């Protein structure tokens, strides 16, 4: 059975700016072959948008949220997620 594509928007709160967090997200998304972006927000959060097979988006969310994820820079306190239909993102970029 083919996994349907999905769009994950995740707002990540913690010590996630100025520590290489967006570049880490980029590497995880590329490893999972997801499209989207990781952007710093003015309030200190990082917004992660990822599109691709839902199970791979769920894996990225698990990596973002995991308390024991070694190698992830910074500190993640909270991740708020929203799921929606994909909009046709191509490639993955940091902003």
Swiss-Prot record:
Domain Acylphosphatase-like: 7-95
Catalysed reactions listed for this entry: an acyl phosphate + H2O = a carboxylate + phosphate + H(+)
Listed GO MF terms: acylphosphatase activity
Matches recorded under Pfam families: Acylphosphatase
SUPFAM superfamilies assigned to the protein according to its UniProt record, in alphabetical order: Acylphosphatase/BLUF domain-like (SSF54975)
Its EC number(s): 3.6.1.7
Active site: 22, 40
Keyword Hydrolase in annotation: yes
This protein's UniProt keywords: Hydrolase
InterPro entries: Acylphosphatase, Acylphosphatase-like_dom, Acylphosphatase-like_dom_sf, Acylphosphatase_CS
UniProt similarity note: Belongs to the acylphosphatase family.
Protein name as it appears in the record: Acylphosphatase
Record organism: Corynebacterium diphtheriae (strain ATCC 700971 / NCTC 13129 / Biotype gravis)
Organismal lineage: Bacteria, Bacillati, Actinomycetota, Actinomycetes, Mycobacteriales
